Each structure stands twice: as structure tokens, then as C-alpha cells.
Amino acid sequence: MAIKRVAIVGLGLIGSSIARAIDERLPQVAVTGHDASDDVRGVARDLGLCDGIVDDPVAAVADADLVILAVPVGRMADAAAAIAPGLKAGAIISDVGSSKAGVADALAKALPDHIIIPAHPVAGTENSGPAAGFASLFDGRWCIVTPGAGVSGDAVAAVTGFWQALGAKVETMDAAHHDMVLAVTSHLPHLIAYTIVGTASELEEVTESEVIKYSAGGFRDFTRIAASDPVMWRDVFLANKDAVLATLQRFNEDLTALQQAIRRGDGAKLEEWFTRTRAIRRSIIEQGQDDAAPDFGRKH
């Protein structure tokens, strides 16, 4: 099937980046945008995002071949219900949420299973809002597609081709497996970052000014992650709680083992652990998933 018109519901970082990428790389595709926030719609209009920004979600999806819900995962069910009356026959519904099994269930409450193709572009920054988006956000990044059993191959191919056209590498995956993988690679790191920064800010022995003044590179990396949209991440943790809790349990066990090694003065254990985990970093660089520049390419 050909995608000639796309509707984007939600014009934050991801939604606005999709709009910009379509404009740059798929200029023949018409784009209509909608956001529940009056302020966001106003900014989107000022920025010239999409071919049109509309106030009504039903009007936004009219005649769209592909509808992308770029809203926090906790709002997926409401967003699906809002657009359902305006969908044309044959339209595909997708999303960009960081959890997939729960999103699929939420969408299915308002929409037929056979038109839902959940997707997760594994890309982003700590910034949010329509002004934060940029067309190259998805370049070389993975987009994981988790179609249900009843979806046609043509529809899956259309969504796959769409994301590839925006610069992404596409992988098809079972929704539950996606949620476990992302709990390890994305959700738990964000939870740890929020915790470390929160702990540092509450230590009575260290003032906030000292935390800011003497922050080393590692701590600054955590603060960058902790600057991410709190509403979005609140919803992600709640939507993917089973996988997050399972991963957090394993992390706590490993952390306890390291705590015991430090207490015992077991340098061999610490070095073995650090050496093994260092290899993961090298593999990420080798696969082009990050910058090999010294100090993560940080400018001083």
C-alpha cells in the first residue's frame, strides 16, 4: 500500500521530528498535525510544522493512510478513542511509545487489531516540545516494529518502508521481548539516572552548589538523562512495570555483589566485572551506536 497522507497526533520531540523528516525526505507525502495542547499547536504553527495543524483530532486523521500517535504511553488509549471516529477504511495506526505490549492493549480497546502496527523509534534527546525536533533524529537509529498476528504483510511493509525512508534501521520483534530488551537498555538506565541525581541533590553532607560545581563527566551524563520528560518516563515505567521490576531486581542483586566486593576489598572481583562490562561499550561503538571520540565527544 502507498502512504500518501500521514497524520501525527502529538507534536513533541518525536512527533515534530517525524514531521520535519517527512518534509525533507518524503516531500510527496502530505502531513497533518494535532496536539491536545493549545500552546503546542500554536508553536507548531509558528514553526511551520506539517502542511496543516488542526484543533480537532478527528479532522486530523481524515483521509490519512498512516496515523502516528506520538503521545505519552499513558495517553494512548484516550488518543486512540479520540481519533477512531475519523479513520478512513484501510488506515494504519502506529505509535512511537517506548513500551509495546501495554500500548498494543491500550490501542485495541478503541481500534480493530488488524490496523494496529506498534513501533518504537529508539531515538531521542533530553529535550522536549515541538521546537526540539530535527529531521535527522532517526538517522542510523533502530525502529522496532511489533505487529500483531492479524496485520497484513503489506501494511507491515508500508510502515517498515516509511521508517526506512526517514533514515531508520527497522527490526521486527515480539512486543513482550521488546519490552524486556528496552527495560535493560533504556528504562533501567533512566531510572538509575533519576535516582543518582535525586540522591546527590538530597545528601545533607554535600550542598547543591557543590554538586553542580564539581560535577564530573559521569555525573553530567546522568543529569542529561535525568533531564528527560518526566511525564513520558512516568508513563513508561508504569506501562512496562513487569519488565522494569524484573530487570531492577537483577540490577539490585548485582549491585549487592559489588557492594560486598568493595567491603571485602576484593579488587579482583571488581576488575573482572569492570573489564567484562567495558567490552559492551566497545561493541556499541563498533556497531555505530555511539561516538568513539574521547570523553564521548564532549566539548570542553
Predicted regions, residues:
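Rossmann-like NAD(P)(H) cofactor-binding subdomain of soluble oxidoreductases
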Residues: A79-A131
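Interdomain hinge/lid region at the active-site interface
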Residues: E208-R276
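NAD(P)+-binding Rossmann beta1-loop-alpha1 motif at the extreme N-terminus of oxidoreductases
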Residues: M1-D56, V61-A62
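Internal alpha-helical scaffold of NAD(P)-dependent oxidoreductase catalytic cores
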Residues: L137-R224
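Rossmann-like NAD(P)-binding element
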Residues: P57-L87, A91-I92
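Phosphate-coordination loops involved in phosphoryl transfer and adenosine-cofactor binding
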Residues: I3-R5, G90, G140
